[in-house]
C-alpha cells in the first residue's frame, strides 16, 4: 500500500553498510525523496545522505515540520529567485509556514523584505526580519508596493496577480501552490 508523507523526524534504529556519520540512537530529521514518500510509517528506510541530525532544542514534531517548508523557502529564494544582497523582495503571506522562512532567509542574504500579512501578524513578521508589513485586508498591495527585484507568492489564487504587479521591469517571481492566470505581457 501507498504510505504518504515526506517530512520525518525520528531515531535511527539501524544503519546500512558504509554509513559512518550516523549511529543507532541518533535523533534525525529530513525530507523523503520525491517518489519515495513514506514518512507517515512507524519506521522508514531512507538514504543517509538526506538525513540530518536533529537539533536537541527541537521536538520531533517541530523538526519534521521544518524540513520541507524550509527547503521550499531555500530553493525558491536562493535557487529560483537568486536573491542578492541589497535587492528588494516582496513575499506574500509572510506569517505562513514557507513565507516565514523566506522572510528570514531573505533578510539573512541582506535583502530588503516587504511582506503582506494581516494586521495581527505585523509584529510577528517584523520580528522575523521584515522591513515592511502591508495589511492585505486594508491596502491594495499591488498599488502600495512597486519596484521589487523579486516576488515570492506563497498564497496563490488572486494573490498571484500581486506578485506580478509589484515587480520592476525584469524582476523575478517564484510561486508555490496554485495561482491565478499570469497577466498577458
Q: Predicted segments — roles?
A:
Residues 1-185:
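Terminal helix/beta-alpha structural elements that buttress the NAD(P)+-binding lobe
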Amino acid at each position: 500500500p501507498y504510505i504518504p508523507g515526506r517530512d520525518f523526524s525520528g531515531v535511527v534504529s539501524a544503519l546500512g553498510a558504509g554509513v559512518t556519520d550516523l549511529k543507532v540512537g541518533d535523533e534525525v530529521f529530513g525530507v523523503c525523496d520525491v517518489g519515495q514518500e513514506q514518512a507517515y510509517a512507524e519506521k522508514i528506510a531512507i538514504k543517509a545522505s538526506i538525513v540530518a541530525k536533529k537539533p536537541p532544542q527541537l521536538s520531533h514534531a517541530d523538526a519534521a515540520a521544518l524540513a520541507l517548508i524550509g527547503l521550499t523557502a531555500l530553493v525558491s529564494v536562493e535557487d529560483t529567485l537568486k536573491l542578492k544582497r541589497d535587492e528588494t523582495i516582496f513575499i506574500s503571506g509572510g506569517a505562513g509556514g514557507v513565507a516565514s522562512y523566506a522572510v528570514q532567509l531573505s533578510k539573512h542574504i541582506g535583502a530588503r523584505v516587504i511582506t503582506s500579512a494581516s494586521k495581527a501578524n505585523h509584529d510577528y513578521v517584523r520580528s522575523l526580519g521584515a522591513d515592511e508589513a502591508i495589511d492585505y485586508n486594508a491596502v491594495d498591495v499591488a498599488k502600495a508596493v512597486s519596484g521589487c527585484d523579486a516576488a515570492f507568492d506563497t498564497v496563490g489564487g488572486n494573490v498571484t496577480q500581486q506578485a506580478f504587479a509589484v515587480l520592476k521591469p525584469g524582476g523575478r517571481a517564484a510561486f508555490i501552490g496554485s495561482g491565478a492566470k499570469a497577466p498577458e505581457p
